[in-house]
Amino acid sequence: MFSSVKKIIQDAKRGKIFILVDDKNRENEGDLVIPASKIDHKKINFMATHGRGLICLAIDKNKAKALNLSLMPSRNSSRLETAFTISIEARKGVTTGISAKDRAHTIKTAIKKNVRSKDISTPGHIFPLIAKDGGVLQRAGHTEAAVDIAKLSGCGSSGVICEIMNADGSMAKGKHLINYAKKFNLNIARIEDLIAYRLKKESLIKLKRIEQVKIGKSDTYQVKIYENKLDGKEHIALIKTQ
C-alpha cells in the first residue's frame, strides 16, 4: 500500500511528484511533494488543479536567512507551529505572480545558490516554510520531510508541497489518499517511515573533542565529549585508561 522511502528518493531524483502522509495523531493528511529544483509550470499546475491546497516552498534556515525572510507571525500560536514566513514573489520575470509559470519562476529564483533578498519581493504568491534543522527527527511535518527528501536525493535542500483536498473541499485522508495515488500513478509514503529510515542510516551524535584527565594519584581517564545533533546538548563518556 505504501512505498518505501528508497522508492520516494528515486522519484525525487527523477523529478516525479510523490505523496507524503503524516501521522494519524497529527494532521493525518497527504501532501504532494517534489524537490524545488525539479519544479516547473506543469507540476505547479498539477498541484493547483489536482492537489487544491496551498502551494508552499519548504526551505532550511540558511535559505530563509539569505532571503531575509521573517516569520509571518512574531509569535507562532498555530497548533503544529508551522513556520510560515511572509509570502514571496520573484522581483523580475513575472506578471501578476499567480500563474503556474510565474509561481514556478518564483520558486526557481528563490532556490538559486547565490540568491539575495533583492531578488524577491514581498508579499507574493509563494509561501515559504522554514524546516527545523533536525528535519523529521525534530519535527514530523511535511515541511521537514520535503527538505529531508530533497537532501537525501541530492536535489538541494528545498521542496515544494501542496495539501491534497477532495473534490468537495474536505481534506483527503486514508483510503481517499490511496485511491488518489492510484488514480494519478503516484507513489505514497509515510513520514514515520522516513523517520525510521534516517534513524537507521544516520548517527545522531558527533564527537566534539577528547581530553585526558587524572583523578587521584594514578588513575587516568579519557573524556569523550559528544554533541546531540538535534538539540545541541553535550554528553560525556568517561573511560579509564590506566
Q: Whereabouts are the PLM-identified features?
A:
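Catalytic domains of riboflavin
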Residues: M1-Q242
